[in-house]
């Protein structure tokens, strides 16, 4: 899968390296199967020390773009499932010896990814790159399938060799697990090399990039921004919350719409595109997505898990209700 997906890597802002790396260099023709067994596992390790506000802003602005790019990938006609995990490090509010904190296990819940990203805050601290890579390798449930694409992206601006865990050992362990460690230095390219960020990538067969983390992303407004955002809001009305998760997750969906809109209308547009893609699946709380994943789901659904307005309906009536929502 890697030989199909990996392409020339160039960067100018955070997430551009990731977007370029998940773009397919070749697409395999064939019938598209959205129920793929292939995975893209992507872990992002954020330096949240006090100088990294610009880095987080760039990440918030580009999240939905990388999701949309990964949704265009095909492997033998299959659409790989995107799983994202997240850590932050180098922050004094992290109360452990190595200043490393897991924010998110691997998940395909993109609203949850967005919520965690927008909740990150910066504060001064010590940045231990080897330690955060080591934790990500040990604590996450990595795929054992060699055909899956597994990548770590670590971003920061302090020497890569700091801390109690030797980065060369952590990166060698990643290489043994067939995981690429890609490093993003927030500063001058040559300074990043002097501070071992290039070596950190090379020892795991990954790639080294540098960015200006304070650079503002320029978005070009289009005449369709308002219309697309209106459609995004209409999409929300087709979601039918069920079980104990439903109400809270539907509220989260609206909050992440708002977060994207606050960044820029173009960011909201990219999120709207995500919401009509196969990557945006919410079967854990949405009746319609659950049915799309398993057409027998309605027959097994417990009545107490239904929303109030649907509790008295038969399985056949629920089927008709879902069919209407699908057409919307």
Question: What is each model feature region?
Answer:
Residues 1-27:
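Bacterial Sec-dependent N-terminal signal peptides
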Residues 204, 208-297, 323, 328:
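C-terminal "exit" segments of structured domains
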Residues 7-8, 82, 273, 284:
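Short linear sequence motifs
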Residues 19-215, 223-225, 293-303, 309-311, ...:
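Divalent cation-coordinating acidic motifs and surrounding scaffolds
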Residues 9-12, 60, 125, 219, ...:
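Residues in flexible loops and secondary-structure boundaries
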Residues 9-14, 67, 291, 322:
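Generic low-complexity, intrinsically disordered sequence content enriched
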Residues 6-11, 57, 113, 288:
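Compositionally biased amphipathic helical and low-complexity segments enriched in hydrophobic
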